[in-house]
């Protein structure tokens, strides 16, 4: 009975969000993880049911590997996002196991967006591109909360907050001067300032961001 229920739920999801799923597939998203994330987003941990994101941290940095899945509007868009400095080189993340003890790695699994403290928001409010001199003002950030037993540690590390935020090392200027590469964060998910507010504002508070290594189950890296 449980297997039948899961199958029926998957069929309903596929038909209800056909456009978003087709977009995700075309854009190179890991589809097993996308489907897993959609199921997870229905849990009581997430108040936002109309939008979620999947970050395939295993793809090269030069790929648009952060997939914003808008279920309300039945579409998916793909964006650049940086990984943590302990995940690997600027070109590609290659280390995923050990994230629970290395805080400079992006935590894997289901994360929930939440309101960031004023000091955090202020820190990333204005970003300047060190290559082009372009300045972005009025940028927003969201705190990230771990909702699984293996990533809830990020909720209680003294003096450390995990955030989804903008930074210049994901910008078009950086990408032009460093082909195929992005800068690296201190364990946060970092976005291109040009599209940061579109993503952060759409996710709001209470949305799922699922950080995955391709289609692999997260348990493989615990």
Report the location of each language-model feature.
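Sec-dependent N-terminal signal peptides
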Residues: 3-12
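Low-complexity, intrinsically disordered segments with a bias for serine/threonine
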Residues: 14-17
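Cell wall/extracellular polymer interaction/catalysis modules
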Residues: 19-186, 193-207, 211-222
């Amino acid at each position: 009975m449980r297997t039948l229920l899961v199958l029926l739920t998957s069929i309903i999801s596929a038909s209800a969000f056909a456009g978003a799923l087709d977009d995700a597939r075309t854009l190179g998203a890991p589809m097993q993880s996308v489907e897993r994330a959609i199921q997870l987003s229905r849990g009581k941990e997430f108040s936002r049911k109309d939008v979620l994101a999947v970050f395939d941290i295993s793809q090269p940095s030069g790929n648009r590997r952060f997939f914003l899945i808008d279920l309300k509007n039945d579409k998916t868009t793909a964006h650049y996002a940086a990984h943590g400095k302990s995940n690997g080189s600027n070109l590609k993340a290659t280390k995923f196991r050990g994230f629970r003890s290395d805080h400079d790695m992006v935590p894997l699994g289901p994360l929930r967006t939440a309101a960031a403290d004023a000091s955090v928001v202020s820190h990333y409010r204005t970003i300047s591109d060190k290559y082009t001199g372009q300045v972005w003002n009025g940028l927003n950030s969201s705190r990230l909360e771990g909702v699984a037993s293996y990533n809830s540690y990020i909720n209680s590390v003294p003096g450390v907050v995990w955030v989804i935020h903008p930074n210049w090392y994901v910008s078009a200027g950086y990408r032009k001067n460093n082909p195929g590469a992005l800068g690296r964060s201190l364990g946060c998910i970092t976005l291109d300032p040009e599209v940061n507010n579109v993503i952060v504002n759409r996710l709001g508070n209470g949305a799922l961001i699922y950080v995955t290594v391709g289609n692999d189950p997260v348990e493989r890296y615990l």
